[in-house]
């Protein structure tokens, strides 16, 4: 789209950009999640509008996609893949590294099973890696990167919450659809490698590691625990509670803005990127207005994380309690 066609978004960005630049945080990134590109309409204009932000905020280092990128409701396997490719190409065109957490919609299996489509058309892990792993330095769909700043040194961990066994049944079909899972192999990597650092750690995942206390989507009356818990999640939850270098957990999946403190560890979720209002507490969304989208610029400065909202919703501020302990106690605590 042309700059003029994006004005319905970018006309609302200047005040937010001014706040980000005034903050002058040493670590800044974009977090966007649950794009579901082309399910309702295209998210590509939203991504293209980010050029306006990046041109004016040179301190933004990378983008994190929280998963569920395309339209897995499309019965045409190539149409589904095309929706994935278009959103990934738009993000890659931003000119900054793009790091992806794989979502439970991304392989297409959930809808293929629900609609009795041929699951052999699913996007399997190797194809997913080719699609989403341009800046992934490993051959897995989970990894970490290290970033040094004047304020401290950090590790960004990107988990794969769809790390399930892709095994076929007697009919050659894949039986596991919406299933969220951390494999034993990934859990061991997380415990023994990802957490093995003196850096402050931020953990990104599609779904929360634990649904306890997380408000989300669906038809449940209380809006709590909308989906099955992440298989393997309790194991990772145990270790992030124990490893005091983990400063925050950031995820999507529930299409809702949550900040929940598990003792001294904040767990953060962010609204879906396009239009849907899946719970009564979500803000109203209107197409071709600023509220059609929702994404954050995430800024870390000292013991605080600032989430500057572009689109529906509000700015948020997160107390990085464990980071404060490093300031006063001189180091991260690994019990």
Predicted regions and their residues:
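N-terminal active-site segment of His-dependent metallophosphoesterases
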Residues: 2-79
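Short active-site segment of divalent metal-dependent hydrolases/proteases
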Residues: 37, 70-71, 106, 209, ...
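Extended active-site neighborhood of metal-dependent phosphoesterases/phosphodiesterases
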Residues: 8-14, 74-192, 235-236, 242-245, ...
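Short, surface-exposed beta-strand-loop junctions and turns on beta-sheet-rich folds
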Residues: 313-315
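His/acidic metal-ligating clusters that form di-metal
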Residues: 13-23, 52-63, 92-93, 155-158, ...
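Active-site glycine-centered loops adjacent to acidic/histidine catalytic or metal-binding residues
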Residues: 34, 67-68, 103-104, 206, ...
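Short, solvent-exposed beta-strand-to-loop segments that form ligand-recognition rims
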Residues: 324
């Amino acid at each position: 789209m042309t700059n003029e066609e994006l004005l319905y978004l970018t006309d609302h960005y200047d005040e937010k950009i001014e706040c980000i630049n005034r903050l002058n945080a040493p670590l800044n990134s974009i977090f966007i999640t649950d794009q579901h590109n082309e399910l309702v309409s295209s998210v590509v204009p939203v991504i293209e509008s980010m050029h306006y932000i990046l041109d004016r905020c040179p301190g933004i280092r990378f983008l994190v996609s929280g998963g569920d990128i395309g339209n897995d409701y499309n019965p045409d396997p190539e149409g589904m893949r095309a929706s994935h490719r278009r959103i990934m190409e738009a993000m890659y065109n931003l000119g900054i590294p793009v790091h992806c957490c794989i979502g439970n919609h991304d392989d297409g299996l959930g809808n293929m099973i629900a609609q009795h489509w041929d699951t052999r058309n699913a996007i399997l892990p190797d194809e997913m890696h080719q699609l989403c792993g341009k800046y992934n330095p490993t051959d897995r769909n989970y990894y970490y990167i290290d970033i040094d700043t004047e304020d401290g040194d950090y590790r960004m961990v990107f988990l794969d919450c769809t790390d399930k066994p892709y095994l076929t049944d007697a009919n050659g079909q894949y039986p596991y659809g919406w299933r969220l899972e951390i494999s034993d192999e990934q859990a061991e990597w997380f415990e023994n490698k990802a957490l093995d650092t003196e850096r402050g750690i931020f953990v990104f995942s599609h779904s929360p590691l634990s649904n306890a206390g997380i408000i989300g989507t669906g038809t449940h009356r209380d809006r709590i625990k909308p989906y099955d818990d992440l298989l393997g999640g309790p194991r990772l939850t145990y270790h992030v509670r124990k490893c005091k270098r983990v400063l925050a957990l950031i995820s999507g999946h529930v299409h809702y803005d949550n900040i929940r403190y598990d003792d001294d560890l904040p767990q953060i979720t962010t609204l879906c990127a396009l239009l849907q209002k899946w719970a009564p507490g979500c803000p109203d969304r209107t197409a071709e207005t600023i509220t059609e989208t929702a994404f954050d610029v995430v800024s870390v400065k000292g013991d605080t994380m600032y989430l500057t909202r572009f689109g529906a919703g509000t700015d948020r501020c997160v107390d990085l309690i464990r980071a404060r302990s490093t300031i006063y106690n001189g180091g991260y605590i690994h019990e």
